[in-house]
């Protein structure tokens, strides 16, 4: 890389301004995803496996549907929608209306009905991988739940009474039993305990043998989650990464390796200027799985389709601190 290009890269770094996360968005993300690290691994408790943020292909909508939490045991598969809503929640049939403290209303789909579509997409995905072959697999093994985590949400009786709805007070009984290992981990353990309790009382007739259950765990573990970009300043973009462009090379998402973190290391201060002037070290670098470190320049970018946007956009890597592959 030439001296001029190194200096241009450092100047572009100096011009970048930190982008901070909105406090309300940050709270919602922390409350609903619980533990960011379980998105790249999975959580086990009392023989049950819990996976978060899995996005299952839905041919009917020609898109992926996200399932917040999936709890697996040999007897039962629980598909769980997690919400941290506050205010009041009313049942209006096809929609649920949330009235927040300020009086504004938000219309949500009926989560019970919406979960049925996600269940069908999940079963279809299992069948494509040689699992869930029986016609009555869903009836014998699957349950759907909606978990409301926020104690400041008042839920209308018609919603709260539904057997597939878990309000915070119902979960609190299990939450109090968990050892103090951090709120998020206690919450996850409580969700699993609730599912195990439901399993014992529901009388499900299915029971997967060890080999088939292991195949099920692997199949769910391999389902994609969201990709994320952590920007300079802390704001996180969630969506789908399409391509990474470094120098003359373009890598599609599938070429970037398995899920995990790809730090984008920049020397933004005086040390970066020293590197640019002397050529000793790299102003910016990233390391992909199984590859040597790649030197970064001002022209390098990433093609990313953020949630809520109508089309992908190209973001300069000078704005990015970390790529999280889902």
Predicted regions and their residues:
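Surface-exposed interaction regions that form or flank ligand-binding interfaces
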Residues: 1-65, 101-326
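Cell-envelope/extracellular polymer assembly enzymes that use nucleotide-activated donors
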Residues: 68
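Active-site beta-strand-loop-beta-strand hairpin of nuclease catalytic cores
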Residues: 71-98
